[in-house]
């Protein structure tokens, strides 16, 4: 419904926790993500760009507490990092330790105001995320309304969605 296929990636997320600040208790997250760009559209093989090169990007993200009970809306602060291994070593030197990794193959579909991601999460299966980035809290209600309308077009409702993160789902399986 107005969406076009963008990039296809493999994302490896390593979340961190701390003995002095348990992010499970505070409903926050600290994550390092390594993203392999597998290509775009239908011009890709299973895991390679057409010339065999795989572009890899890394970023660190802090996620604040969820802002409501019906969505995954929260403050997210992200920054690209040059050296993934050095950043991981810095976090560990500061007392953070890695927890269960989340690995997924993600297809990005872009709409006018919304991005839909189809995720194949290792150990969990397939999920869809609908996301609208807002730069002002006053726009959040409108964004949730647009997501609800898109779900209805797909024969779904907000009741069919989950606010449980992939990390939490994987940890519950252990």
Where do the PLM segments sit?
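N-terminal strand-loop-strand beta-hairpin
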Residues: 1-113, 157-174
